[in-house]
């Protein structure tokens, strides 16, 4: 599954010094070592997610409809449950911070047919989002926190998952031609 997310953008970014190279490594989310995903899930999946940089794969790219970004997070080597999170954040623009913007959230239980989605960006919100440029052109460390007020419903069946809170730091590459990261796929 290729990545794409909804956009957030608001004010112009503050001047900043580029960080380390953005390309995710095979052993972690960000080369700088400060990527992560934290989330609280209830319902059909009851879990507290606390994935540090090491062992977490993340990637992100811009999306067109609606404009924004898409970021995904996955633990290398799986886990119980083996989850893939995809955040489509509306209104995000390259290098700009964002506040109070909609999120389309998909949670996939890898190796099964269990897929949960909010089917739009009205059920989850990013409170705040910040971007810092990395050395590779068009690449940014994106840090965000937010919440969902309604659950993501099962694509098949009647189950639902509420991701009550989430926060993450991951990679978005706006210039996909320069990215050497392989697309993340569902198993």
Provide a role label for each language-model segment.
Residues 1-7:
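Bacterial N-terminal signal peptides
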Residues 9, 35-39, 144-146, 170:
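Small side chains
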Residues 12-120:
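An ectodomain-focused feature that recognizes extracytoplasmic/extracellular
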Residues 46, 78, 131, 151-153, ...:
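Generic "edge-of-domain/loop-turn" microfeature
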Residues 96-172:
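Acidic, glycine-rich flexible loop segments
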Residues 169-187:
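Short, low-complexity, Pro/Ser/Thr/Gly-rich segments in the mature regions of secreted, periplasmic
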């Amino acid at each position: 599954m290729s990545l794409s997310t909804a956009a957030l953008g608001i004010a112009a970014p503050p001047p900043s010094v580029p960080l380390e190279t953005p390309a995710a490594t095979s052993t972690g989310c960000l080369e700088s070592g400060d990527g992560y995903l934290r989330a609280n899930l209830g319902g059909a999946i009851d879990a507290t997610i606390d994935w540090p940089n090491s062992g977490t794969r993340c990637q992100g790219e811009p999306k067109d409809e609606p404009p924004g970004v898409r970021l995904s997070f996955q633990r290398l080597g799986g886990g119980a449950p083996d989850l893939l999170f995809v955040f489509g954040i509306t209104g995000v623009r390259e290098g700009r911070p964002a506040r109070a913007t909609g999120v389309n959230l998909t949670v996939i239980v890898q190796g099964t047919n269990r897929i949960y989605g909010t089917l739009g960006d009205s059920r989850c919100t990013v409170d705040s989002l910040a971007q810092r440029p990395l050395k590779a052109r068009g690449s940014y460390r994106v840090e965000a926190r937010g919440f969902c007020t309604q659950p993501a419903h099962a694509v098949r069946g009647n189950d639902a998952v509420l991701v009550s809170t989430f926060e993450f730091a991951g990679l978005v590459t706006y210039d996909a031609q320069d990215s050497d990261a392989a697309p993340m796929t569902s198993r």
